[in-house]
Amino acid sequence: MTYSFTEKKRIRKSFAKRASVLDVPYLLATQLQSFKDFLQDEVAPEKRKNEGLQAAFTSIFPIVSHSGNARLEFVSYMLGEPAFDVTECQQRGLTFASSLRARVRLVIMDREAPDTVKEVKEQEVYMGEIPLMTTNGSFVINGTERVIVSQLHRSPGVFFEHDRGKTHSSGKLLFSARVIPYRGSWLDFEFDPKDTLFFRVDRRRKMPVTTLLKAIGMSSEEILDQFFDFDTFLLSKDKVEFTLVPERLRGEVARFDFVGPDGVLIVPKDKRITAKHIRDIGAAAIKQIVVPEDFLIGRVVAKNIVDKATGEVVANANDEITETLLAKLREAEITTVETLYTNELDRGAFISNTLRADETATRQAARVAIYRMMRPGEPPTEEAVEILFNGLFYSDERYDLSGVGRMKFNRRLARQDVIEYKLMVKGLASKAEAALKNLAEASGFALSAIQDLVSLMPFGARAMVENSTLSEVEALAAKLKPLGANVEVREQLTLSPRDIVEVIKILVELRNGRGEIDDIDHLGNRRVRSVGELAENQFRAGLVRVERAVKERLSQAESDNLMPHDLINAKPISAAIKEFFGSSQLSQFMDQTNPLSEITHKRRVSALGPGGLTRERAGFEVRDVHPTHYGRVCPIETPEGPNIGLINSLALFAQVNSYGFIETAYRKVNNGQVTSDIEYLSAIEEGNYVVAQANASLDANGRLSDDLVTCREKGETILAEPGRVQYMDVAPGQIVSVAASLIPFLEHDDANRALMGANMQRQAVPCLRPEKPLVGTGIERTVAVDSGTAVVALRGGMVDYVDAARVVVRVNDDETIAGEVGVDIYNLVKYTRSNQNTNINQRPMVRVGDHIAKGDVVADGASTDKGELALGQNMLIAFMPWNGYNFEDSILISERVVAEDRYTSIHIEELTVVARDTKLGPEEITRDIASLGEAQLSRLDDSGIVYIGAEVEAGDVLVGKVTPKGETQLTPEEKLLRAIFGEKASDVKDTSLRVPSGIAGTVIDVQVFTREGIERDKRAQAIIDEHLRHYKLDLADQMRIVERDAFARVERLITGKKANGGPKKLAKGTVIDKVYLDSMDPHHWFDIRLADDEAAQQLEQVKDGLEQARKDFDIAFEGKRKKLTQGDELPPGVQKMVKVYVAVKRRLQPGDKMAGRHGNKGVVSRILPVEDMPHMEDGSPVDIVLNPLGVPSRMNVGQILEVHLGLAAKGLGHKIGAMLRAQSSAKEVRGFLDQIYNSSGKSENLDELNDVEVLEMAENLKGGVPFATPVFDGAKEEEIKAMLAMAGMPSSGQMTLFDGRTGEAFERKVTVGYMHYLKLHHLVDDKMHARSTGPYSLVTQQPLGGKAQFGGQRFGEMEVWALEAYGASYVLQEMLTVKSDDVNGRTKVYENIVKGEHRIEAGMPESFNVLVKEIRSLAIDIDLERY
């Protein structure tokens, strides 16, 4: 393999046994791709797919006026350029968005001739702002970065389930079916305990299902025909003959003797008919058999029976045959009677019974009944009934199964091969009767069908033909087009009568004991709605509001001569979008503690949110791990607490397909031969295959070598022959998420602890000097690069300039496009605040002259080290008890760790002050504050704003501000002072911004925002000038490189050419050489007149190109200057806003929470002097002492293995360091490295590195050789021992330690080694808090709670019991009164303390008064009797 520029600096030794067949896909692809599909901004309007914004527009437009005389059509949309880039939006508190404009066409028809277009107006209309996604998959909303979390919701389609016997006391299973559309009414079918089948619409009152079947146009006869097989009886005067279908008799008890044609008895009466009997009946070829009359009595008539002579209906379908009816039938000379075939076992008479319970008789009556159920209390007019019913499931506007819903529906009804299409026919409503007749004749349709169609026009033209294949529908469309009908073929996304019937059929089959119910937690029944889809739904909701308003205004459009922009008001759209991105449950404040937390947040999948589950309603099953999660959703990473199992993370190789189902990657296997073909399968498809695990044994040719292979099939684990295997996992770690795959030796950790480990890595605070983990899993580089924290080269080239804040790269010629500037400038992020107040700082990794390729890491970010994720520090750890300081997971730490700033982190606090325009006059930001002394103002400049670099602590003034005070009555002394000095100092009060308590640090940045029209102060101007200076530097660098390239090209072009003349009196015919060119400024080279016309032309082109580049740079600079100098958008009433950023250094201290990567968390209990720490034989002290009891019960043994391997890594590093100090040759170093890298696990080709690179790499390995033990494919025990032996360490990983205080050896050997240990974001500085007198709650008058409110500590019920138990009555009294809510008492205490008297007078607690009032509000008179 080839190593990148960064990898060469430090190769990570991997213990993986299997070569990677598929690289980990880009980790943010789900978010970016989803939003890209939503916008489609890079696609030409005519080539856009019908999804995202395009789908939203096409589903609402065209909007037709009520009269039908005017319509507004959608043509296309375009997105403008965003006004500010991402960083500008973050600084100014703006939303990173671009304006959406839609081109719409207003078509006005002629009133006299409705088919004639009178006029057409086309115009671009502003449709609001659409927030844009940053390159890292987040959004900047009002200056803060947010993430839209994907939602896992129930897929549209049809689902069959039962109540698990919970509804009825008998434990009977009640089956139900539910049709869930993407949008529209839910349709439920359910059995009741008496086996009658009902339906509900939107969980309203239930009605017999036959009412719905009649409403969709079926008669009773048709209903019975659909759901039952028929038995045929032949009637004659004296006997009844039964037409035998032998199979139907199985399991029945014979009610008479079955005698064959030869008189042999086949089944005696009262005997159960078995399979043998049925074979005998078949062999005897009995077609008809005479049966007693009581065999027919009680059966149900299948079809209406009509007396042919009189035309009278003798029996209706679904009537029960009684003796009277039988006599009537004979009387009417009916010879054949068909009855329903039912039995107790597997052919229930459910539909028949339901039909009997149904009171409606006709289609119209059924529709009226449904109308009454949907709109109780409204009078059912014929038109209203039709509109409501057709709107329920047939209207495209109101009902949409969506593509995925239709796919799931068809799959469940076993119609996989037929995609259903429907023919939308519009433009018939205006045709006269005669025209419709012609149309009917030409198309071969009944006139009634076409008239039906016309009556359905108002609710989205209905289909003429449904559930047909594409070719059938297209053939019909071709017939209708010439007849003036507006024909459109589209997939059937509404329900059809056939759909409803088939759903009921399957439900009846389930009740009959055939078929299986659906598992709603199966990932084939749950789909992901990503950003794009969620945004599209919101946009559509906004458009629907616009549509209503446009419909109203369209009628005025023709009379008032309005333009499209007069009709459309973009506010509802903007409001819907703003509400979604700003306050939706799925739009979350981005977790930016470290790169991993950022990337995990974007890969999160939540079952909560609008249209999803709620915490309270979600049961155990939804939260549990399901077999289909394999490779799709991580079984480990989920929060602890009420959200467990509802919020998940995508697995490493998971991706979301076009339908929204999560897929995972598999290798194809053909007859036991594993290929390198990769296929992505969703949970639906995977159910049909046999899948082997990634660790299945393969021979040298890549064939499965075991006789039986462990596989998964239909959610079960089985052993299968190699020939049966169809797919194989791509990687052992494909079942876990990013965070879980960063845990080395995960396979040795208990799942509960692995969950904590995965979650706690996301809380790790970036350290001042990030350090790569000695023991990693090999995925650290992927995470660092994909998270966007590390800066990655966009194009290859040579590094031209480097400083702490920027890297300039001259791009390779073959990677530049003509007319493009061949310069990449990477402005690094310096000391910037993240959402969690941690510090984001990028450090360049390249030097001037380095050659880099596309994708190489140019600069490290927060928590990355040489392009690898580095969340913590490698610490020398000993597992032993130490004087109780590691009791209950406490952590004992050496003072050296603190002294070396190993866990020191920088946190940046943003403090804001605003100057408003008040009723009494404007507030002013100034240095002139009378009440402050010079010492307090010493850090402020002339504008009253703190200097950058000032060291500040709690209480210091950062920004001076005064607010006008209302005029008050002056005392005589003040009047005298004012008379003498004539000043008005007393009418302002000091409202300066001060450093809050608990913060002490350095001011690192100040930003001043001024409203348009208000004069900027000096400081604001200076900040703008500084910005412009930086921008100018960038442009100058670009220009310098462009010029250098241009001059190099010119030099190559004109050297050796003859000249006709030029500067410095160049004679005609002189050959130009280098000496001549070096003697003048390169800008004068363009004045040389060349003899060769072609070369002269090329020279002119280069000159023009340079001039154009200068012009472009001037325009860019001017644009930037204009942007910076224009006024800032500030909230109403705000004149000026100042933001001050203070960097706070947080050193490790007792009370801080720390953790390893295996869920081994604890709190620092004591920081011990180095000399007292336990030390090894050579005198080196350990850094951290952990409790050995924290391992066995927690079952996270991975930490022990990590410690052993970490020790080997460090030992090998020391050996390499010793070789370098001894100045060993590159060959010797290469030999030792080869021994380390190629003795086991994945081999590395060190021959690719030259000697200089080998020595540079060895220099980087001095601190330890980094190892990778991939999840489920990591280092074995023997390999760890081999590495320990190579490093010259004891293979047990245990050593004798000595007590630092006494110098004596501890009794037994102790496990010592290096572990990657993290400092978490739960810092004692943020939690420590003490209250003096502070705010009180308005109602109860008790002190508020919490640090943010400067609150008190709650003295709860149990604490009161404790004091009662001790009999400390006075302490208890003051706790419940003067220290809490006795208002008069606490004032009195204050007075007493001031007077020097130390006594209390407890009175009535305010909360008692609140209780009294509460009881009185319940109309109970309660009063206090005072004695």
Curated annotation (Swiss-Prot):
Matching InterPro entries: DNA-dir_RNA_pol_bsu_ext_1_sf, DNA-dir_RNA_pol_bsu_external_1, DNA-dir_RNA_pol_su2, DNA-dir_RNAP_su2_dom, DNA-dir_RNAP_su2_hyb_sf, RNA_pol_bsu_bac, RNA_pol_bsu_CS, RNA_pol_bsu_protrusion
PANTHER family: DNA-DIRECTED RNA POLYMERASE I SUBUNIT 2
Signal peptide boundaries: none
Reported function: DNA-dependent RNA polymerase catalyzes the transcription of DNA into RNA using the four ribonucleoside triphosphates as substrates.
Class of the enzyme per the UniProt entry, highest EC level: transferase
Quaternary data: The RNAP catalytic core consists of 2 alpha, 1 beta, 1 beta' and 1 omega subunit. When a sigma factor is associated with the core the holoenzyme is formed, which can initiate transcription.
Database matches in NCBIfam families: PRK00405.1, rpoB
Catalytic activity: RNA(n) + a ribonucleoside 5'-triphosphate = RNA(n+1) + diphosphate
Gene that encodes the chain: rpoB
Name of the protein in question: DNA-directed RNA polymerase subunit beta
